[in-house]
Amino acid sequence: MAANAGMVAGSRNRNEFVMIRPDGDAPPPAKPGKSVNGQVCQICGDTVGVSATGDVFVACNECAFPVCRPCYEYERKEGNQCCPQCKTRYKRHKGSPRVQGDEEEEDVDDLDNEFNYKHGNGKGPEWQIQRQGEDVDLSSSSRHEQHRIPRLTSGQQISGEIPDASPDRHSIRSGTSSYVDPSVPVPVRIVDPSKDLNSYGINSVDWQERVASWRNKQDKNMMQVANKYPEARGGDMEGTGSNGEDMQMVDDARLPLSRIVPIPSNQLNLYRIVIILRLIILMFFFQYRVTHPVRDAYGLWLVSVICEIWFALSWLLDQFPKWYPINRETYLDRLALRYDREGEPSQLAPIDVFVSTVDPLKEPPLITANTVLSILAVDYPVDKVSCYVSDDGSAMLTFEALSETAEFARKWVPFCKKHNIEPRAPEFYFAQKIDYLKDKIQPSFVKERRAMKREYEEFKVRINALVAKAQKVPEEGWTMADGTAWPGNNPRDHPGMIQVFLGHSGGLDTDGNELPRLVYVSREKRPGFQHHKKAGAMNALIRVSAVLTNGAYLLNVDCDHYFNSSKALREAMCFMMDPALGRKTCYVQFPQRFDGIDLHDRYANRNIVFFDINMKGLDGIQGPVYVGTGCCFNRQALYGYDPVLTEADLEPNIVVKSCCGGRKKKSKSYMDSKNRMMKRTESSAPIFNMEDIEEGIEGYEDERSVLMSQKRLEKRFGQSPIFIASTFMTQGGIPPSTNPASLLKEAIHVISCGYEDKTEWGKEIGWIYGSVTEDILTGFKMHARGWISIYCMPPRPCFKGSAPINLSDRLNQVLRWALGSVEILLSRHCPIWYGYNGRLKLLERLAYINTIVYPITSIPLIAYCVLPAICLLTNKFIIPEISNYAGMFFILLFASIFATGILELRWSGVGIEDWWRNEQFWVIGGTSAHLFAVFQGLLKVLAGIDTNFTVTSKASDEDGDFAELYVFKWTSLLIPPTTVLVINLVGMVAGISYAINSGYQSWGPLFGKLFFSIWVILHLYPFLKGLMGRQNRTPTIVIVWSILLASIFSLLWVKIDPFISPTQKAVALGQCGVNC
């Protein structure tokens, strides 16, 4: 659809489809179609053209149905070889190559065209298609993709609609290329040996000249690829002048686009040795703990041992996936040499970028606008980037803010590209406290920067005015500029909405260049339909993007995560377009980095330990987990396909070989994997037009099997022929047989609320349903199929976002993550028992198990944190009096724990402050959010009591630096950790009082108990500071609840006192008789 042509809204279920045009705008006049004597091709909409004799080209001699020569030749070679109107088989015309089934011809005046496909400007499979004013040459590589496409729709192109109806250009080569796809069979003509070979043109002078020309071209090509195998050269190739430079460029272009940078062995080997030693020490430690119970405090001892065993298992699940950490390095210059050479059409893959937002009051439109602006200004060919914004709250505020953003982008994007600034989100660029004149050499930069800053400030004022206007909702609902009622006034009951703001025919920037396509999408919502929150919105974006642009790769970001590096897409393509990695890589995950966090990162918002240690460790196994944002996907992986694995990938790993020995027969899992690969190859076979099947087209012997294949695809992907056709375009781009006029209705259809019914969406395809943390589940399903993922961590962070620095918001965020993990733990997709028939590696499975079981650690953790207070109150302890031999185990255990942590910091580069903050928040979250998540998850799964999904507030600091850090917001999550703090403080006072009253001999055991209790309080210290706030004042409600719970607990303990026997109680009360 044309940009700025108006919003499209509708519902497939209600048979509604309307176009709401901007106020005062009239429908744009249609461009006059190119024609010759009124003849326009009814397949592609191009000129029919003329024949070799100068007459109008007539493809069908029976009905003269207007078809141009390129479409005629394509139908003969790749299609059904019949006229679309009368179904008469096409005959060969002079100048066209022969295809199988053509009648024998005695005349030999056209043998060149009869036997061979011409290159360059010739007509044939590498014909030139004139489209939108430019020539595009389809190579055999792109034809190889086309012949797999189901020809489900056809029609004439409508001016002003989606222009890229041809396969995306990154699969198109220039006409001078002699590239031939080896997977495409060469046309063969059967030669009758009884005839003279000269009659076929063989051994003639022309034939010999063609053979000589072919050999010369092959020799030239061999010279170009000679540098690929340097060991095969007899000596160094001495190239001088431009020829030598060209050879060097070709050699550089064939080098890998990335490489693995291993951790230095002197760091990694010592780290592994300490892990093994720690495991051995743990075995001796538990042997001592189990065989030496505390007789007078058996309950305390038993609880402590159970907790310690669980902590050890948790450590194993967390530690071993970090066994083989790696770093990666990309080469953007090699990517440019191979796919994006200057002066040549870019061969980079098309990418669709998804931005998701729900509530503009919690996710300010200005933040979303900055994210969109950073995407539109990215360093990537504009015709290869499309930005889709999902508004799942159907807010008119988001729509109007996006309209203002599109207008400001016309000025902002050329400014960014002209002066090469970073980052390209204006709010964060102008807020940088750096020397912005560094490395700037253009005298006009200062003046233009000052003018652009003023433009941005005016843009902010307009956005703020929209936000202020949205605070008061009219009683009759919102209305658009032309007086039409806003279709999304009811966020739970509204039609689907689509608006294209930028892109083709959407206007140019201030420098006269095109901008990337910007599309607003709000999926249909109706009562009685399950919408699956963010996962459902992302799946709707997959489908609508496949219909409109169909980028080969997808990148999703949250609305508050802007592009901090304009090279982010190129960084991802260094892996996705690498011949060795791309075919088996499902996604490239980038680390999350944040702005606006306090200097000391009180609540571990940066999560450095996870992103810089755990994720690097997973990258050395099967790849990092998907974290929900900043991730570039292979579209085929989201469609549920298996990866293209090599024989080496399918071989049993070295552990299996060493344990089981060599085997002559292939393992069952190996054969199953090969069978799945074969099934995937078969599923890529062409799917044909249903109408053609019904009419009995020649060449298909089993029509029923084709029909069943079509029904299987509809059951899998839904009933959208255009979308199904797009799934076969593995290199991206719109199927050439698609009618652009039908794209609007089809886009509305695929985002309708009932489209996913009785399909595999959310089960095997797209983002997987069943958890509020759909990211973990989606990545797990891909890894279980055998895909690998890549962790890309360039020196400059590619994405930055905002994090909740307020204590209550942070705990609510952690609660949502933990609740999602509990839901997965109690589902059929639990990594403990799911996916054993797939290709998921053992250590990768351990990492996923750790990801879903960590909330359960909150139960033993909170029990262990209360134990010090109980010991101080009862004058008991969890450990008996130990000898020097037993004390050695405790010393070695603590030493191994610290050694492991220090060595991790050494090879990862993480600071000790970040490590300590992570340890502190592990206790804070474990005693609050994780504990609540366990019980809420049980209620949701077992009792069906659902909890509300709350969007984390992303409002900016407007009252000063880190003002939000000191704001207190009441939540029940604060009660458990506050209770633990009060109990430990009370226990310390009671223990010290008891030691003072009992004399000197009580101080020795007291120190161990006090150290235990102080250790708990130190971990909860950031939480205590958060309770105090800026005024060092804790809310009364928290104090009352915590003291009440602590008092009740203490009184009950004194009353029950489970460690005193009935006889001792009787003695204490003076009730003992003579038999005592």
Curated annotation (Swiss-Prot):
Location (main, coarse): membrane
Write out the GO cellular component annotations: plasma membrane
Query: Which residues does the annotation say bind Zn(2+) 2?
Result: 60, 63, 83, 86
Quote the record's binding site residues for Zn(2+) 1. 41, 44, 68, 71
Q: List ligand-binding residues for UDP-alpha-D-glucose.
A: 356, 362-363, 392, 533
Pathway(s) where this gene product acts: Glycan metabolism; plant cellulose biosynthesis
Which InterPro entries would you find in this protein's record?
Cellulose_synth, CES_Znf_RING, Nucleotide-diphossugar_trans, Znf_RING/FYVE/PHD
User: Glycosylated at which positions?
Assistant: 948
The transmembrane segments are 268-288, 297-317, 852-872, 885-905, 921-941, 972-992, 1004-1024, 1034-1054
Cofactor names? Mn(2+); Zn(2+)
Give positions of the RING-type zinc fingers. Answer: 41-87
Q: GO BP, one example? A: cell wall organization
* Membrane topology label: Multi-pass membrane protein
Taxonomically, the superkingdom here is Eukaryota
Q: Which residues form a coiled coil?
A: 446-473
Residue intervals annotated with topology Cytoplasmic: 1-267, 318-851, 906-920, 993-1003, 1055-1076
State the active site.
392, 775
**Any idea which UniProt keywords this protein has?**
Cell membrane, Cell wall biogenesis/degradation, Cellulose biosynthesis, Coiled coil, Glycoprotein, Glycosyltransferase, Manganese, Membrane, Metal-binding, Transferase, Transmembrane, Transmembrane helix, Zinc, Zinc-finger
Compartment list:
Cell membrane
Q: Where does Mn(2+) bind?
A: 534, 558
**Molecular function GO labels:** cellulose synthase (UDP-forming) activity; cellulose synthase activity; zinc ion binding
Family named by the database record: Belongs to the glycosyltransferase 2 family. Plant cellulose synthase subfamily.
User: What is the protein's known function?
Assistant: Probable catalytic subunit of cellulose synthase terminal complexes ('rosettes'), required for beta-1,4-glucan microfibril crystallization, a major mechanism of the cell wall formation.
Protein name, UniProt field: Probable cellulose synthase A catalytic subunit 1 [UDP-forming]
Which organism encodes this protein?
Answer: Oryza sativa subsp. japonica
